[in-house]
């Protein structure tokens, strides 16, 4: 929160934040999960990987625990790496939501990351139903930009349309 302190001390309206909703992920990334299944990984193996991530077992130790499974299905190693890298997730995003509340007055726009929005207008790994109420309860009047990460080969127009509809639904618009 040193950045907030600097913003407050300078009073500048040109210094701020552009939060990326990917940091709130609480479930594994569907496109990576599906890709691993297609490459021969099992639900059991993937669930074990996810649980190790939830339990905050370090990646190096997790790779050792899963070594035999990775040997049988090399794609599992890549999926596991992604769970600790680009598409991380955690049990809860409460701490991150508290951080969002603190920086909201200094946000220019927000990146509404999505990887897969299902037909029921639910992003399966990022808890928009927790994020949007925090934004709605604030004085934020900027944009939430749809940032579709085309990882799974889904229809980008459909995914973007679903994301916009999901956010509007959560905002009761």
Regions found by a protein language model. Give the residues of each.
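Histidine-acidic metal/acid-base catalytic patches
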Residues: 2-173
